């Protein structure tokens, strides 16, 4: 660190991203990427003609992508905001709905960036322990009077709450935003997008990194009431209006529209997860009932240090 670094940043422990080795080929599992190539429609959309347009700024309104997303999710375009990866959507949400007087509540075992962002933005963290079986007890979130973020399915456990449980948390916190991070929802979770028109305090965040094979393109979506999305756009247009590049806009639109490829690759990953779980259990591992594209397993035969 230099002597010029601000006290705020010097006190923050940054997030450590998953290693991206470049030296040789690995069976790479550390960041839960898709084993499948992007949709052929995505490859066609990122054409030479589009590459030539990189001299021009991207559309800050993301109009074509928003129309495709609205049609796919059954929402209006003003209920959706694209982000440079769902991390940006989540960061914008914390910037919009939390501050030094308004804490963020989240589980003790969950996505590590929540705590990093709280440190960066001077947001107090209300960390709520999971139960001994790694499940989240919705009653722990009743009447908190705080912004809440829940990864559902959770990472790294892969466990998911039913939509009805999230709805109960929304009803118990009507005056605070409840953020549902659905990065892994397409592998067996129950999305809360159908609740958006009933709860103006619900913000759902999804990513194209896992089930749509676009981790390297960096694209996420925040979905909620038009008023919540307007709040997020207030942050976006104060920070980075051109947050989605031209090629990612085209790739994201094509990925949403190619539902057959999405369904086929998603089903294949779920089948592989089931087979792998059976194989691990046959070898004496305890494996949680994952609704994600990864498994949380343990064994008494060796400890982690070995």
Predicted regions: what they are:
Residues 1-56, 144:
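N-terminal "arm"/small-domain region of PLP-dependent enzymes with the aminotransferase-like
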Residues 63-103, 121:
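Phosphate-binding glycine-rich loop
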Residues 77, 85-98, 154, 162, ...:
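Glycine/small-residue-rich loop that forms an oxyanion/phosphate-binding "nest" at active or ligand-binding sites
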Residues 80, 104, 178, 202-204:
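Hydrophobic/aromatic residues located in beta-strands of well-ordered beta-sheets
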Residues 126, 130-186:
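Active-site phosphate-binding strand-loop segment of PLP-dependent enzymes
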Residues 201-281, 285-288:
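PLP-dependent aminotransferase class I/II
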Residues 270, 282-306:
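Conserved PLP-binding catalytic core of the aspartate aminotransferase-like
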């Amino acid at each position: 660190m230099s002597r010029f670094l601000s006290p705020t940043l010097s006190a923050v422990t940054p997030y450590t991203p998953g290693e991206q080795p470049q030296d040789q080929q690995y069976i790479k599992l550390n960041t839960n990427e898709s084993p499948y190539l992007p949709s052929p429609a995505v490859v066609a959309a990122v054409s030479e003609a589009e590459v030539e347009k990189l001299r021009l700024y991207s559309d800050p309104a993301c109009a074509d992508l928003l129309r495709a997303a609205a049609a796919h999710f059954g929402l209006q375009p003003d209920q959706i905001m694209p982000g440079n990866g769902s991390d940006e959507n989540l960061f914008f949400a914390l910037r919009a709905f939390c501050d030094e007087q308004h804490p963020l509540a989240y589980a003790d075992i969950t996505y590590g960036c929540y705590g990093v962002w709280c440190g960066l933005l001077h947001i107090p963290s209300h960390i709520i322990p999971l139960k001994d079986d790694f499940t989240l007890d919705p009653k722990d979130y009743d009447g908190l009077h705080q912004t809440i973020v829940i990864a559902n399915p959770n990472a790294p456990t892969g466990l998911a709450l039913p939509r009805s449980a999230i709805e109960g948390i929304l009803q118990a916190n009507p005056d605070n935003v409840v953020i549902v991070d659905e990065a892994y929802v397409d592998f067996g979770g129950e999305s809360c997008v159908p609740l958006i028109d009933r709860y103006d305090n619900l913000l759902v965040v999804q990513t194209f990194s896992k089930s749509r094979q676009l981790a390297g393109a960096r694209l996420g979506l925040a979905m909620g009431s038009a008023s919540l999305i307007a709040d997020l756009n207030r942050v976006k247009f104060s920070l980075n209006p051109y947050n989605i590049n031209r090629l990612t806009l085209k790739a994201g639109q094509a990925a949403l529209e190619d539902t057959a490829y999405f369904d086929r690759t998603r089903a294949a990953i779920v089948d592989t997860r089931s087979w792998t779980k059976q194989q691990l259990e046959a070898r004496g591992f305890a494996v949680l009932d994952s609704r994600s594209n990864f498994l949380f397993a343990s064994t008494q035969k060796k400890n982690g240090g070995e």
